[in-house]
From Swiss-Prot:
Belongs to the universal ribosomal protein uL1 family. GO terms for biological process: regulation of translation; translation. It comes from the Bacteria. This is Large ribosomal subunit protein uL1. It comes from Prochlorococcus marinus (strain AS9601). Part of the 50S ribosomal subunit.
């Protein structure tokens, strides 16, 4: 078992073995995020689904009201005049078969891959490279589209794709330690609503299992999911 560093051990003593109210949990996470850089705040949510069944898979996108605080590199595989449109819209990498070949050779210098439908037969051949990294374009995720410019704009502005992994756990980066706890909660609430809205049709029993938040270099804190779901803004 890996031994905790002195810093992590000290931070862990500030966290009680209980479920926390959302804003209290976020306050603790922010307080513990004292590294020499602006730590990323993450959510790790275990759902009552078994993704090996197609009707229990979760993969979708959400636009967080305060963005993620991160800049992402977007690659676009398209053809014809759409290549210049991708460049004009701010894509970091763009091309046709040349980009397909580059990726196939190991060029993975991007965080998100968008493709137009006409290029998907060629992109499909990259499944071995893209699949394990969760980068294969998908219509449900908004990454297979003819509206390249709008897709790039939305993802650059904070739209993000998330999915449940093989264990039914959703991992999402939803802000930075420099965000206010209220902004972090707004993002978290939006994420919760998206997960509920996109509940797989085959999900059985208890849908929400556990809900933890953490920072890049800090310990995790368990959230009260009911308090997140039941929250109603004043007025």
């Amino acid at each position: 078992m890996k031994k905790l560093s002195k810093r992590m051990a000290a931070l862990s003593t500030k966290i009680e073995d209980r479920i926390y109210a959302p804003l209290e949990a976020l306050s603790i996470i922010k307080e513990n995020a004292n590294a020499k850089f602006d730590e990323t705040i993450e959510a790790h949510i275990r759902l009552g689904i078994d993704p090996k069944y197609t009707d229990q898979q979760l993969r979708t996108t959400v636009v967080l009201p305060h963005g993620t605080g991160q800049s992402i590199k977007i690659a676009v595989i398209t053809s014809g005049e759409n290549v210049s449109k991708a460049k004009a819209a701010g894509a970091d990498l763009f091309g046709e078969e040349d980009l397909v070949e580059s990726i196939n050779k190991g060029n993975m210098e991007f965080d998100l891959l968008i493709a137009t439908p006409d290029m998907m037969p060629k992109v499909a051949k990259l499944g071995r490279v893209l699949g394990p990294r969760g980068l294969m374009p998908n219509p449900k995720a908004g990454t297979v589209t003819n509206d390249i410019a709008n897709a790039i704009k939305e993802f650059k502005a904070g739209k993000l794709e998330f999915r449940a992994d093989k264990a039914g756990i959703v991992h999402v980066r939803f802000g930075k330690a420099s965000f206010t706890k209220e902004a972090l909660f707004d993002n978290l609430k939006t994420l919760q609503e998206s997960i509920d809205k996109n509940k797989p049709s085959g999900a059985k029993g208890k849908y929400w299992k556990t809900f933890y938040v953490t920072s890049t270099m800090g310990p995790s804190v368990q959230l009260d999911i009911n308090a997140v779901q039941d929250y109603q803004p004043e007025g």
